[in-house]
């Protein structure tokens, strides 16, 4: 695996079913993930989401300027912008990966990352109300004996949870994750 990276290039490409745009960076590495370009730091994976109002792809340059080193790009953005993405990859020595859907790719990458920790005890907290408090109480009790990782605050959504699992490290013994939903059938 590349030094200090959460997933190797090959593992990431395989997990997300992606393809390389341009060339792989000579120093491929990502040690965190972000969906907000303003939250990118050195060696971040930037995942630009496409919403009903905004398209995160317009913030790729800002993410790279903030330190992002790996970028997912939705296939739907490639036809008009492939040359631009290739130029940005060269300019910033970054790795760009084309994926069908950036949200789904984030979730698949997070799933693959968690699979690297088979001995991690995983606890999911769901419910109508009180999830964050319950998660914090469980974490407080278990942290007396174990090294515990949790999602921060109430980052429990379809984007927040995948971003949170990238905080798991080898020293963690227990992961306690709050899982929220905003539509029927979202948790399965």
Language model features: what each stretch is:
Residues 1-108:
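N-terminal leader/targeting and accessory segments in enzymes
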Residues 98, 103-188:
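Phosphate-binding loop of NTP-binding sites
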């Amino acid at each position: 695996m590349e030094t200090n990276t959460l997933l190797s290039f090959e593992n990431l490409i395989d997990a997300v079913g992606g393809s390389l745009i341009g060339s792989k960076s000579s120093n491929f590495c990502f040690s965190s993930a972000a969906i907000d370009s303003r939250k990118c730091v050195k060696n971040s994976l930037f995942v630009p989401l496409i919403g009903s109002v905004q398209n995160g792809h317009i913030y790729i340059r800002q993410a790279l300027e903030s330190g992002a080193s790996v970028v997912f790009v939705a296939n739907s953005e490639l036809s008009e912008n492939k040359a631009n993405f290739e130029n940005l990859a060269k300019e910033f020595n970054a790795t760009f990966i084309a994926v069908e859907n950036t949200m789904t790719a984030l979730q698949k990458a997070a799933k693959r990352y968690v699979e690297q920790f088979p001995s991690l005890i995983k606890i999911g907290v769901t419910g109508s109300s009180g999830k964050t408090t319950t998660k914090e109480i469980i974490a407080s009790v278990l942290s007396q004996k174990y090294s515990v990782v949790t999602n921060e605050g109430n980052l429990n959504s379809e984007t927040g949870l995948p971003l949170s699992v990238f905080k798991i490290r080898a020293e963690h013994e227990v992961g306690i994750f709050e899982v929220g939903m905003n539509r029927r059938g979202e948790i399965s």
